[in-house]
Every structure is written in C-alpha cells, then in structure tokens.
C-alpha cells in the first residue's frame, strides 16, 4: 500500500511507489498530490488540517477518517488505521526536518511492519533482525542508529562485526556496497538503512525476506 503525505512528492516518485504497492491512501494534505496526479485513493485520513478546500468529484465517495488527536503523526495514524503488509510512504521526506524526524520515529514504532519511506533521492527503512540486500557494487548505503544498537555487516566497504553504533558516538553513514551480497544484522529495531531511491525494489525485497521484529503490545 502506498501512503501519500503532504510533503515533497514528485509524480515519478509516486508512480514508482504505486508500481510496487498499487493501493493508494491519501494522508491529509497528500490528497492534493493524488488529485494533481489523477490518482484516486482508496481512503483519505489524518487530522485533516491541511486538506484542500475542494476535492475532485471523483473523490466524493472515498471513505474519509478524521483522527483529531495530536499525539502521533498522520503517517502513524495511517499505518494504524489502514495497515498493510507492505507500506510505502511518499511525501514524508524532504520537507520540514521535524516532520522527517517524526517519520523516522514512526518507523521504530512500526518495526513489526515492512515500512519504507521514499523520496526523490532516498529510500529509508528499518533494519530487520537479519536479512540480505543485493545492490550494485559501489552503491551508497548508510546505516544510522536511532539508539545504541549492535550491528554486524558483510559486503560493505567498511564492514561491522558485532560493533555498536550509537547516535551519540559512532554512526554508519556514507558506506558503500563492496560485494554482490550484503548482510545486515541488528541486535534491536533501532537502525535506519538508507539507499538511493532507484533501488526501491531491492529494499522492498530486503525487508520482505526477514520475519521482522515482534510487535510491541501495550
């Protein structure tokens, strides 16, 4: 499922996501992007504080869910309300930095799901416990810890062997692929994996091959 937010979302990026996850959910102001593209969403939801005043006639029968609470992001609301096995978020990166950070937080909250954020330049997802990623050699690949996490990797220019990454200390940005097969193993659901946007399909396969993290229960 593709979740379309109100942030920067060029049509080619939306179309690339829809090619992988063709059901569209418009998240608040993302409905304007959908209308501009001529794509009809299956659902519109959010706190609805940034929707356009008028919607196209084709949108008149679409279910609308108003979620006024302000304790979570619209992206988080969307993942909770209309869950999917594969969730691609477009229009959530490249705008306000605080919105971006909140969406990275949402990746951690939904670590049990296959969630990827897609922009014109990057794909961002959460590293599962252990999985294999296949990318062309020399492809940029970054690991960013959201909290201390022990990482083991192979197939990168600078591999890790049960080493700690920590946002207060050592991070793993601007690494690159050095072998046909990259393995990434994480001790906890806490490390972002960032790759060029043209490798969306490979990142989806990377997430889908792992059992993922257990769902946290309240």
Model-predicted regions and their roles:
Residues 1-8:
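N-terminal nucleotide-binding beta1-loop-alpha1 segment
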Residues 6, 119, 145:
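Residues on the solvent-exposed faces and adjacent turns
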Residues 9, 70-77, 125-128, 165-170:
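Active-site glycine-rich loop that binds ribose-phosphate moieties when present
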Residues 10, 16-20, 212-218:
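Non-catalytic interaction surface on structured domains
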Residues 10-13, 33, 202:
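Short N-terminal binding/cap micro-motifs at the start of the first secondary-structure element
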Residues 11, 96-100, 124-127:
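Short, well-ordered, mixed-charge alpha-helical segments that flank or form enzyme active sites
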Residues 17-20, 25, 29-120:
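Acidic/Gly/His-enriched mid-domain segments of enzyme catalytic cores or analogous surface patches
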Residues 126-218:
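Long, charged alpha-helical interface segments
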